[in-house]
Every structure is written in structure tokens, then in C-alpha cells.
A protein has these predicted regions:
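Anion-binding and metal-coordination hotspots
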Residues: 1-372
């Protein structure tokens, strides 16, 4: 039933101009207070920072216009890197998509995933683990290709970036640097090194369990450390940096803009978890758990549709404000001169906007209770 609803919703929105070419995918974990059904509730890597609880994994796919397309659910011990290719294969079959460009974060990627994407001739824009990927760390970041200044607008503000394209071993990388983040990273590192110097003056033992400090240390003996200037110099290359790998022909700014849109999926997860109360989940059966989570996905679809309709009116409505204003609507039954009437409260401005966008007409302010 879930698949049927998702496919019919997509078909309803689809027209001759609809092309589901750009797909954003991310996953999150949803923890359980109990066992979590017969198979879904398993211990795994917890993005909720609750490794003590059983959990399930939820993936949401969003199109290039920011609209939820479909959701997928797995047991909580499922690794992110195993989910991307099967989901994209199913997506193409279900929605009859010939050409698709996948945008996903670094946690979704492995060497096997990359090989599968290449074998299927799928377009992709993927985040890269710049610290743990040896090729990126040692060759891509140090490549002599020049950085080109870019400006990205976000919430009315201009953010300065610079980017360079590196072609290496048949792969295309885009190295991006956020100048503000680079300055912050440098300042944070200077603060840590200063704190290190103070700690070293007091004694080495306090540093043994501090992984944040030990990144910049070298071991002198079993319990003695010193600041390692080579490690500090190496860290500078990562200041404000993120790296993309893509096989598209998009220019660096276009690729960056696509990748940055992943925040829409992350925002959807936050909305589902908090505004729509996806957690806590107290259901005992897999099928009822799936139904509970799918209701949150449908709420995301409705939220997206309403926001799109409000935008079409040239207006902007805050979701918490919309909910609060709609919640303030009330009716009271009163008796006057032997007759009973229903009196409706006046809608607040944001509620009026939402109702207008949804095409919903309110009943009269005062009406005969008998007629109702």
C-alpha cells in the first residue's frame, strides 16, 4: 500500500514537463523505546546518539524541487553504504525514470557503491571523505589547479567560496573551500593548540584520553607527548574544505549548489522527528511501525505541497506559525433567545493564508446549530 500511495502521488504531480532527474537521498536512524517490532529494531550506528536503544533506518528521497518522492525503511543494523544503489534501482523501476543524477553525502559511499554507479552509467554528485580517502588527501587537495572565486547566496546573504576542478585517475573532483569556515577552522585550531600548551605545562597525563588534543600531538615516550608542528601544518589543508566527486558536466558552482541542497533532506528529517512526532515509537509490530513512520512521510508531502502553494501566492509562511494559527481556530456553541448557535473565532493572518492556499473555505462566523 505504501508504494501505491507514493506512486500515485508522484503520478498526480507529474506532467509532460516533469522530469525526475535530480534526486537527493539521505538516511537517519529512529530509535525505539521498546523492542522495535519483530525485525526492524536492531542495534547499529545511532545518529540519535543513543547506542543503548534499538533503532531502524529511514531513507527519504527528495526531487530537485524539494518535494518528497518516496521513503525506504530497513532494520537498524543496516549500513548506509549498502542502501544507495538498491534504492536508486527501485526508484527507476517504480517511477519509470531513464536518466537520474544522484546527490548523496559521504557516508553513503564505498568503493563498491562507486563501481555499481559507474556500471549502471548513473550520474552522481557525491561527497568525499577528504581525510580518509588517501588519493584525495595526498593528491587532490595538493593539486596545483588554481582556485576560482565563487559566490553563493543563502537566505539573502552572500557566502564566499572558491573551487578548483581536479581530473585524476579518470575521476573528476571538485575541491570547495568556504572562506568563512576556513577562518573559523584556523581560529579553532589555534585555540586548541594554546590549550594544549597550557596542559603540557601542567603535565602529560591529562592528555591521554583527549582525542581532540591528541590529533596535534606526537608521542615522545609511553606517557609523554609534545606538540607536532607537522600535524598542525597538515591540518591546514582541510580548513573550510569539502570535496565532491562527480561524473556530470556541471560547472563547480552548479555542482556545489546541487550538493548544498542536501540540507532539504536533513531539514525533512528534523521536521519529521520533532514537528510530526515520529519519535518516540511505541508500536510492537513491524507493519504498524512502518505505518507510523509512513504517516510522518505523508505529513512531509502535505507540508511541502502547502508551502509550494503559499509560495505561488507570492507569500511565505513559517510552518510552526501556520500550525499555531490553525490550532487557534475554535468554535463555541451558545444559546440566545431560545436558539442555539455556533460561533467561529476569526482566523489569524497565517491561518487565513494557509486556508486560501489549500482552497479551503471556512464556515460562516455565526450559524444555526440546528442546521449543522
Amino acid at each position: 500500500m505504501k508504494d501505491v500511495v507514493e506512486e500515485r502521488l508522484f503520478a498526480h504531480r507529474r506532467d509532460l514537463l516533469t522530469r525526475l532527474e535530480l534526486v537527493f537521498m539521505d538516511t537517519t536512524s529512529l530509535s525505539f523505546e521498546g523492542a522495535g517490532g519483530q525485525t526492524l529494531g536492531q542495534h547499529g550506528y545511532s545518529k540519535d546518539h543513543r547506542p543503548d536503544l534499538r533503532q531502524m533506518i529511514l531513507a527519504v528521497l527528495i526531487d530537485g524541487d524539494g518535494r518528497p518522492v518516496c521513503s525506504e525503511m530497513w532494520p537498524g543494523n543496516t549500513a548506509d553504504v549498502t542502501t544507495l544503489v538498491p534504492v536508486i534501482d527501485r526508484l527507476r523501476r517504480r517511477f519509470d525514470i531513464a536518466r537520474v543524477c544522484v546527490v548523496a553525502d559521504r557516508g553513503m559511499i564505498s568503493a563498491e557503491t562507486m563501481a555499481e554507479l559507474e556500471a549502471r552509467r548513473l550520474l552522481y554528485i557525491l561527497g568525499v571523505r577528504e581525510r580518509s580517502d588517501k588519493l584525495v588527501r595526498e593528491l587532490v587537495l595538493d593539486h596545483p589547479a588554481p582556485f576560482v572565486p565563487l559566490v553563493m547566496k543563502k537566505r539573502g546573504k552572500e557566502i564566499e567560496y572558491e573551487a578548483k576542478t581536479v581530473l585524476l585517475a579518470g575521476r573528476r573532483y571538485i575541491v570547495c573551500r568556504n572562506r568563512q569556515e576556513a577562518e573559523k577552522d584556523a581560529a579553532d585550531r589555534a585555540s586548541i593548540v594554546a590549550a594544549l600548551e597550557r596542559q603540557l605545562a601542567k603535565g602529560d597525563k591529562a592528555l591521554i584520553g583527549n582525542t581532540g588534543f591528541r590529533r596535534y600531538l606526537k608521542t615522545i615516550s609511553e606517557e609523554h607527548f609534545a606538540i607536532d608542528p607537522d600535524k598542525i601544518e597538515e591540518e591546514k589543508k582541510f580548513d573550510g574544505i569539502f570535496v565532491l566527486r562527480t561524473n556530470t558536466d556541471l560547472n563547480p558552482l552548479e555542482a556545489m549548489l546541487c550538493y548544498k541542497q542536501l540540507w532539504t533532506v536533513e531539514q525533512s528529517f528534523r521536521t519529521a522527528k520533532h514537528l510530526f512526532s515520529t519519535r518516540p515509537i511505541f508500536h510492537k509490530l513491524d507493519e504498524t511501525i512502518r505505518g507510523h513512520v509512513f504517516c510522518s512521510f505523508l505529513a512531509l508531502v502535505l507540508k511541502s505541497e502547502l508551502e509550494e502553494r503559499i509560495a505561488a501566492l507570492g507569500r511565505v509562511g513559517s510552518w510552526p506559525e501556520i500550525i499555531a494559527d490553525l490550532d487557534s481556530l475554535a468554535e463555541t456553541e451558545i444559546e440566545y433567545d431560545g436558539k442555539r448557535f455556533i460561533v467561529r473565532s476569526a482566523p489569524r493572518p497565517t491561518a487565513s493564508l494557509a486556508l486560501r492556499a489549500a482552497g479551503v473555505a471556512l464556515p460562516p462566523t455565526v450559524r444555526d446549530a440546528a442546521a449543522s
